[in-house]
């Protein structure tokens, strides 16, 4: 038997229904914030991710799916969405559009060769937004509140963890101090961090190895290396978040795993541990990829992680289950279910030849709110029995009033 590749999933049944509901909420919120949908290729030139994400990042060095096609082109399955959006922005000269900033959102599959686990797959789905062209701190606050409000609307009580990485110059000064501090402790660091001290020292701050937590606790703070301009920018963002009533905490160890961020970075944390998404400002990425100097800010969230944390009890509900046994009842059930569906009522009926007892059980499994119980005796009198499946109360309704009655009780 051929099986799906490790780290991938089939989405069907109840889970597929939840996905559609989550994506509908995302689309509705995107529309309110006036973001336009964008689709970019699933695979791109490998150079795009090497230059965009960073040659020394774990994503590029360990996790990308790279291949050479029949035209001897080096390509990669996209591991994230921002680099592809920026490539499209440059290639299609969106920086010349009349309406600025350019505000776009995406929703699609990404690929990373990681050890599969809860909320972590090799094929996964992200939705995200990118706002290109504005350097205003109000735009940072909008992006943060945007992502925060989407998760709140999905019933997730998240906290924003936010940090100030400072300007490029600030970070370079801090890196030197961090390397100077860590070098005497190099043998006490994990193997990855021993490599990072030469290639990407800021990523050491995000290491999850407990044995070196004491070393990092005494490391220099990035706060001591911020310029006045960097601090002023960051404080403006926090002021906006206060006015917007966003629940946030400043976390000076937060760096994220992508090299293109500068100034503000943030993550959306659930229960102070699980990151459902995050983002930040990247004012130099477009230029690094061959475009003009364009400020930008964005975020991305993993849909699988969101769905894993949602209460999914309400997603398998139907409004009405129409019960029938014999041929006369089946014909009537067919007519009624069609009329209900034309009135946007979610309903189901017996198409498997089940007994009445089995249909009651099936209706309960579907969390049906109401039951329409067809029987020949009622139909001969022009009546239909309707049962409230919560209170268990039954009423007889004239057949020609059944749709109006159901519309009135759901």
Which sequence ranges carry the predicted segments?
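TRNA-recognition modules of translation machinery and tRNA-sensing kinases, especially anticodon-binding
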Residues: 1-410
């Amino acid at each position: 038997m051929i099986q799906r590749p490790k780290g991938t999933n089939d989405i069907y049944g109840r889970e597929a229904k939840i996905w559609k509901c989550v994506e509908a909420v995302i689309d509705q919120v995107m529309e309110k914030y006036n973001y336009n949908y964008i689709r970019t290729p699933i695979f791109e030139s490998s150079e795009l991710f090497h230059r965009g994400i960073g040659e020394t990042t774990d994503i590029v060095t360990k996790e990308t799916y790279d291949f050479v096609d029949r035209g001897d082109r080096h390509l990669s399955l996209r591991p994230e969405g921002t680099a592809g959006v920026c490539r499209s922005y440059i290639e299609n000269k969106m920086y010349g559009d009349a309406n600025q900033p350019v505000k776009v959102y995406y929703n699609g599959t990404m690929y990373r060769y990681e050890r599969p686990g809860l909320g972590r797959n090799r094929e996964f789905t992200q939705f995200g937004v990118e706002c290109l062209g504005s350097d205003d701190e109000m735009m940072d606050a909008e992006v943060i509140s945007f992502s925060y409000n989407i998760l709140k609307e999905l019933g997730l009580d998240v906290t924003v963890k936010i940090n100030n990485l400072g300007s490029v110059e600030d970070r370079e000064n801090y890196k030197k101090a961090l390397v100077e501090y860590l070098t005497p402790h190099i043998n006490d660091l994990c193997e990855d961090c021993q490599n990072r001290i030469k290639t990407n020292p800021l990523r050491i701050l995000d290491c999850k190895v407990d044995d070196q937590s004491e070393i990092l606790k005494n490391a220099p703070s990035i706060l001591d290396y911020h310029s006045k301009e960097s601090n002023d920018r960051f404080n403006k963002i926090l002021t906006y978040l206060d006015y917007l009533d966003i629940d946030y905490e400043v976390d000076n160890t937060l760096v994220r795993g992508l090299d293109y961020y500068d100034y503000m970075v943030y993550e959306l944390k659930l229960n102070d541990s699980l990151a459902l998404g995050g983002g930040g400002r990247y004012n130099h990425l477009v230029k690094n990829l061959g475009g003009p100097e364009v400020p930008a800010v964005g975020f991305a969230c993993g849909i699988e992680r969101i769905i894993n944390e949602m209460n999914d009890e309400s997603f398998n509900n139907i409004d009405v289950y129409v019960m029938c046994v014999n041929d006369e009842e089946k014909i009537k059930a067919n007519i009624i279910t069609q009329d209900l569906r034309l009135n946007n009522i979610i309903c189901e009926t017996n198409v498997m030849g089940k007994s009445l007892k089995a249909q009651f059980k099936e209706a309960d499994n579907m969390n049906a709110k109401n039951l329409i119980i067809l029987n020949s005796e009622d139909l001969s009198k022009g009546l239909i029995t309707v049962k409230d499946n919560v209170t268990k109360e039954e009423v007889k309704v004239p057949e020609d009033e059944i749709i109006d009655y159901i519309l009135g009780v759901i």
